[in-house]
């Protein structure tokens, strides 16, 4: 794949690079510039534009293309505007320059996650409007802050607001992930993030002594139990070629805290873990297992949750789901191979599914290395433009799904 010269650059690519240059990077994203960018897109495309401030300084921008039948539920195209931090010294090019090399690769933070999707939505809608199309169902595009740090000041609040309910969303698309093969990954569910801190208290004393009932000994027992569980899940994944990472529960020890000096046995120590719990797990039984490991370690061992998502939802991927039927039919017609999976991480789709809206996570980037959050995150312009083509086919099918029994 080679690149066109600057004078020949596709206008969609130019717009993509313009958006990439907006520094919506955590922890201090320039959300105001992003909102202004989408307001201008709405003006140019003749779309409705609504700004919803879900928390001070956190604005969800909603662009709306009305359908011909307002009694039908709408299509929601969601994307987040923030991106993760960068280590500039590890990048070949400035991560906010949107540099395009001679081969057509665009280097920028957000190139894959997920500013490409935002522009692909917009450009697909632009094409369809220019061609004079109208569809029965309204299409809403939501551009949401805060996803990269949990969405607690973004989609989590937005789905609770009357402005969200007024959208009457019947189906949603959000981000997926690149796929290095010919296939396209599509996510129909997500693992649930549980952030757990285990605290152990014990006898303090001088570090030259063999003290009993120390905080470290008891914490070691819990850590060993959890890491043994981790190994068991890892082996289950490795031994079954049909399982994907999102189908098992992962855990990583992410923080150890305790101690005041080399020669003092600490009275308190703690370990923090990031669990990603598979949607088919019995959450009550799993929490009881965590508690039992703490109890088995001895007195004075407790756990607390910094985050505990308890609402896993699965969007059916068969013809019983008319949204999936429409989505997969277009992909089949375009000869796109789909690989349905459970998202191993967490996205804003979990909040959307939790309020009863079926949703798929889909980023049309095949033959592309997975570089989200990585140094030199990049996307080839041809892959980006192919994504616009795909959405240009998907949106008419989804926005023309016949009235469901609940809508008649």
Swiss-Prot record:
Entries under PROSITE patterns matching the protein: ARGE_DAPE_CPG2_1, ARGE_DAPE_CPG2_2
**GO BP annotations listed:** amino acid metabolic process
* Compartment(s) where it occurs, according to its Swiss-Prot or TrEMBL record: Cytoplasm
An annotated GO cellular component of this protein is: cytoplasm
Cofactor(s) named in the record: Zn(2+)
List positions binding Zn(2+) 1.
80, 113, 175
- Cofactor, free-text remark: Binds 2 Zn(2+) ions per subunit.
CDD domains attached here? Answer: M20_AcylaseI_like
**InterPro entries noted in UniProt:** Aminoacylase-1_M20A (IPR052083), ArgE/DapE_CS (IPR001261), Bact_exopeptidase_dim_dom (IPR036264), N-acyl_aa_amidohydrolase (IPR010159), Peptidase_M20 (IPR002933), Peptidase_M20_dimer (IPR011650)
In which residues is Zn(2+) 2 bound? Answer: 113, 148, 373
Q: Which residues cross the membrane?
A: none
What keywords are assigned to this protein? Cytoplasm, Hydrolase, Metal-binding, Zinc
Reaction catalysis annotation: an N-acyl-L-amino acid + H2O = an L-alpha-amino acid + a carboxylate; N-acetyl-L-methionine + H2O = L-methionine + acetate; N-acetyl-L-glutamine + H2O = L-glutamine + acetate
Show the active-site residues.
Answer: 82, 147 (proton acceptor)
Q: Which domain of life is it from?
A: Eukaryota
Q: Where is it mainly found? A: cytoplasm
Catalytic activity, EC: 3.5.1.14
The main enzyme category here is hydrolase
MF-aspect GO terms: aminoacylase activity; metal ion binding
Subunit field text: Homodimer. Interacts with SPHK1.
Which NCBIfam families has this protein been placed in?
Answer: Ac-peptdase-euk
Q: Which family does it belong to?
A: Belongs to the peptidase M20A family.
Explain the purpose of this protein. Answer: Catalyzes the hydrolysis of N-acetylated amino acids to acetate and free amino acids.
Q: What is this protein called?
A: Aminoacylase-1
Q: Which organism is it from?
A: Pongo abelii (Sumatran orangutan)
Organism lineage? Eukaryota, Metazoa, Chordata, Craniata, Vertebrata
């Amino acid at each position: 794949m080679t690149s066109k010269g600057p004078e020949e650059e596709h206008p969609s690519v130019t717009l993509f690079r313009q958006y990439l240059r907006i520094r919506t990077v955590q922890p201090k994203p320039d959300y105001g510039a992003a909102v202004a960018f989408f307001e201008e897109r709405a003006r140019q495309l003749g779309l409705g534009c609504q700004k919803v401030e879900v928390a001070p300084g956190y604005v969800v921008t909603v662009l709306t293309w009305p359908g011909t039948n307002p009694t039908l539920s709408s299509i929601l195209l969601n994307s987040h505007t923030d991106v993760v931090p960068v280590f500039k010294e590890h990048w070949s090019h400035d991560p906010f320059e949107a540099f395009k090399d001679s081969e057509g690769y665009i280097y920028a933070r957000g190139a894959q996650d997920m500013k490409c999707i935002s522009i692909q939505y917009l450009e697909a809608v632009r094409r369809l409007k220019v061609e004079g199309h109208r569809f029965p169902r309204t299409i809403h595009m939501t551009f949401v802050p805060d996803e990269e740090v949990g969405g607690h000041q973004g989609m989590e609040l937005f789905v609770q607001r009357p402005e969200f309910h007024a959208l009457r969303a019947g189906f949603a698309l959000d981000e997926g992930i690149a796929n290095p093969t010919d296939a396209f990954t599509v996510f129909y569910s997500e693992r649930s993030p549980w952030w757990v801190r285990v605290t152990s208290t014990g006898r303090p004393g001088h570090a030259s002594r063999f003290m009993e009932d120390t905080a470290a000994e008891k914490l070691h027992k819990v850590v060993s139990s959890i890491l043994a569980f981790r190994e068991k899940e890892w082996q289950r994944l490795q031994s079954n070629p049909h399982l994907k990472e999102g189908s098992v529960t992962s855990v990583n020890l992410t923080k150890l805290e305790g101690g005041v000096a080399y020669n003092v046995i600490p009275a308190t120590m703690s370990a923090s873990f990031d669990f990603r719990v598979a949607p088919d797990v019995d959450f009550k039984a799993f929490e009881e297992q965590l508690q039992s490991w703490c109890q088995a370690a001895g007195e004075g061992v407790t756990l607390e949750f910094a985050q505990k998502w308890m609402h896993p939802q699965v969007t059916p991927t068969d013809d019983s789901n008319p949204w999936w039927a429409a989505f997969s039919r277009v992909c089949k017609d375009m000869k796109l191979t789909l690989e349905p999976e459970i998202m191993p991480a967490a996205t804003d789709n979990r909040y959307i599914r939790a309020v009863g809206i079926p949703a798929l996570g889909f980023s049309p980037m095949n033959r592309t290395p997975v570089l989200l959050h990585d140094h030199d995150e990049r996307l080839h312009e041809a892959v980006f433009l192919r994504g616009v083509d795909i959405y240009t086919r998907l949106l008419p099918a989804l926005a023309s799904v016949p009235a469901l029994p609940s809508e008649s």
